[in-house]
Regions:
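Phosphate-binding/catalytic loops
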Residues: 95-176
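Conserved active-site segments centered on acidic
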Residues: 2-75
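Alpha-helix C-terminal capping/helix-to-coil transition sites in glycosyltransferase folds
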Residues: 79-80
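Short, Asp-centered acidic motifs that coordinate Mg2+ and/or phosphate
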Residues: 83
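Redox-cofactor binding/interface segments in oxidoreductases and associated redox assembly factors
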Residues: 86-87, 107
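Short glycine-/acidic-enriched loop or helix-start segments at secondary-structure transitions
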Residues: 20-22, 48, 93-98, 117
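Short glycine-rich anion-binding loops that position phosphate/pyrophosphate groups of nucleotides
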Residues: 16, 89-92, 112
Length: 176
């Protein structure tokens, strides 16, 4: 097994929910093989409170997560990226900066849990559920990604497999 560490950037427009969740999942489950980052094309400037609550509920420390611009990752001195995943449809349609390292890119669209409004009549349960489902959907995709033989697979096959992962929504899915 290689000692190589891969740099992975997750993008969504606001960098306040889905991309933050993805960054946290990969940091937690990546086994030290990955440096996970997240950013947005138009960052909101703060992480959605329900995203932080979802992470905290799972025992993930939240103090290091912040909403930031993707410009940080296109600037001189930024980490050379190996993979860039857009996780919202808006970011997938935008013209991205030139990333250092010429990373593989693909789209892993996840419904935006932040569009579910917390209501007082149910104690915000609908919004909590939306964030929980977004977390689980992203976790499934990241686990499929982590199972790929990155050190031994050819580039074309790897690109195809990470694209297929983005189309995967089923619990028991695999990437053939």
């Amino acid at each position: 097994m290689s000692d190589r560490t891969y740099n992975v950037l997750f993008l969504c427009t606001g960098n306040s929910a889905r991309s933050i969740l993805a960054e946290a999942i990969l940091k937690r489950e990546g086994g030290g093989r990955f440096h996970a980052f997240s950013a947005g094309s138009f960052p909101k400037g703060e992480v959605h409170p329900a995203a932080l609550a979802q992470l905290a509920e799972l025992g993930i420390a939240t103090e290091d997560y912040r909403s930031k611009s993707w410009d940080e990752f296109a600037a001189e001195g930024a980490p050379q990226l190996d993979f860039v995943f857009t996780v919202c449809d808006n970011a997938a349609g935008e013209t991205c900066p030139i990333w250092p390292g010429q990373p593989m890119t693909t789209h892993w669209g996840i419904e935006d849990p932040a569009t579910v409004v917390a209501s007082d009549h149910n104690g915000g349960e609908g919004q909590r559920q939306a964030f929980r489902l977004a977390y689980l959907a992203m976790q499934r995709r990241i686990r499929l990604f982590l199972a790929l033989p990155l050190e031994s697979i050819d580039e074309l096959s790897l690109q195809r497999k990470i694209r297929v992962i983005g189309q995967t929504a089923d619990e028991g899915a695999s990437v053939a």
